[in-house]
Amino acid sequence: VGGGTTLINENELLKTLELCKKLFNIKEISCESDPNHIIPEKLSMFKGIIDRLSCGIQSFDDEILKKIARYNKFGSSKQLQEKISKALGILPIFSLDLIFNFPSQTEEQLLNDLKIAKNLAPQQITTYPLMKSNLTKDNIAKSLGVETKDNEFKYYQIIRNFFKDYQQNNGWSFSLEKNQLNDEYVSSHHEYLGVGSGAFSFLDGELLINAFDLNDYAKMIQEKQNANIAKASFTRKEIIKYIFLTEMFAGKIQIDKFNQTLNCDLEKELFKELLGLKISNAIKKENGALITSEFGQYLFVVLMKDFYTGMDLVRAVFRDSKRLKNKDFINIMKENISSI
């Protein structure tokens, strides 16, 4: 359950999740929240309902928190640590989300973030690389400064080494213990259905996009209309590439299982791509599986980062009501999107 602050109205969320579990065979529920909505009394309402809660902290460095306008909004490093400590142990999995590779972030600042996160001992720690696009790069430069050196690969190596005693779930997620709940649903589910305004679905080789405007979405639902306002169709090879990316992000693909699921021959369909990855020592074939190397794991983090950055550009198009009203058809790949 995404959208940033899904716990902002706990009573409504609880009713919604209980209805979903009643109507559908839902086995696991993961929710997002922020540091202002992890009060123990409120979290206790969701025992037996929410299996994992992800909380965006971004950093424990006060100077960085001030630069990204989170210090006054969510509290200082000390206050954040106190909030998290009280929130732990209520729901099965609490995921603490950090961001690394801020412009001007030092190795010392990164290690301090990692040490604090580890000392708090949440069940899961997720470390996202800073995601920049044409939409956000100017604002990032304005608030955090211009990047003189990109430390992403170096910092990623530090992170992996720091959490070598943890279970690595995928490219950027680490757990105290092995768990089956994947924090990136796109890598564990080839198809998914999005419900709600602005939600994405991927079904039968098509990306479907729901209306972003809440009033438009509500009207469509009330009138029992299809809430999809756009879709994009993918070729068979594009689908194979997409699923290959999302599965390799988790570090390993069983070739026979992949072929059986997609009714394809992976090594034939993506011969050139696999050859390039093998030559660059990003992946290797071992016992019928494709496995990422340390460099390969980072490479797929970069690719997944670009995937999410691209989805942000799609969101920007469909949030622009003027653009939507003036066009009968939108080609996402050809839209000129100005920075904000």
Regions found by a protein language model. Name each.
Residues 2-264:
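C-terminal scaffold of the Radical SAM
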Residues 201-340:
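Charged, E/D/K/R/S-rich low-complexity terminal regions of large eukaryotic assembly subunits
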